[in-house]
Swiss-Prot record:
This is Large ribosomal subunit protein uL22. GO terms for biological process: translation. One of its GO terms (molecular function) is rRNA binding. GO terms for cellular component: cytosolic large ribosomal subunit. Belongs to the universal ribosomal protein uL22 family. Keywords: Ribonucleoprotein, Ribosomal protein, RNA-binding, rRNA-binding. It comes from Jannaschia sp. (strain CCS1). The keyword RNA-binding applies. CDD domains: Ribosomal_L22. InterPro entries: Ribosomal_uL22, Ribosomal_uL22_bac/chlpt-type, Ribosomal_uL22_bac/org-type, Ribosomal_uL22_sf. Part of the 50S ribosomal subunit.
Amino acid sequence: MSKDKNPRRVADNEAMAKLRMLKTSPQKLNLVAGLIRGQKVEKALTDLTFSKKRIAVDVKKCLQSAIANAENNHGLDVDELIVAEAWVGKNLVMKRGRPRARGRFGKILKPFSELTITVRQVEETS
């Protein structure tokens, strides 16, 4: 009568990886995630390698993890993978402050975000 302990959250031809607590704002992370959406994984890795954005290094690690999950856990062919989804969410926002003139206090927000990348195997048509 018990439920399946680990139900599959993606389709049979998909694999995914998540990164949480990334020290950047969701807006900045979404700029980099938008670069790789819908692309083949080889091109996405190349784009992330040569991107000048600081967070591109972490996005590349997450994409490599999704590729490794697809190959090792789900038996998918790496050469036929595309980035099906790359979505960004908000995480916590640390609130800090800085003393300002005349006894005031400036609020400093330090946002965190999370990233989920799903790769899908697509049969190449020729």
